[in-house]
Amino acid sequence: RAYEQARLSISYSNLNVKIIASHGGLDTGPDGASAQCIEDLACFRTLPNFVVLSPCDSNEMFQAVKTISKHKGPVYMRTGRSSVVNITNSNKKFIIGKGMVLNKGIKVCVISTGMQTSVAFNALKYLKKQNINPTLIHMPSIKPIDKNLLIKHAKTHKIIISFEDHNIMGGLGSAISEILSENKPIKIIRMGIEDEIGRSGEAYQLLKRYKIDEKALIKKIINFYK
């Protein structure tokens, strides 16, 4: 409903407005499809001048707010509903346009954003016990995205898996594909909501239903190490 205002009143005039949107993605849970915004990152990525962010935990969100308060220009930042364990350092400065390597591995590189990074991090713990060691990158900055980090890891891995609580069209997976198709083509698997409308249910139930939970990621990764 407010998208046209963001487009004409903020983007067009390049106003110094910050939008912090809570309850993003399927994490909204029982409120159902009418309240689940699973295409917001795609919408705001297309608006000129907008920075688009999706931090993974409270530590990073706190640092991101400090950073965007000093940034001149429009920003859209997505936050979740559920509580998650902090992965990032509370003192680590947030830099727009930079990703974060959480684990250095081989063959498979998982790139996640927002609260899905916690899901991916938990999956990584299980995989390491099975002697499977993929790389995990957290990408809180969707626009601008860390182009150099993407190209660097595309050169050293056989496959990239994007992992997001968002429609696979227009979100993190699309942003990654756009960069690498032009600079370092590599096989990319986009794990997200596959062009469907959301449903009502607890967040963990919905992640399972749309195959973007911990078990789904583990299964996908194991297949590439066989």
Residue ranges and their predicted role:
Residues R1-K104, V108-C109, P134:
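Conserved thiamine diphosphate
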Residues T28-G29, G80-K226:
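Thiamine diphosphate
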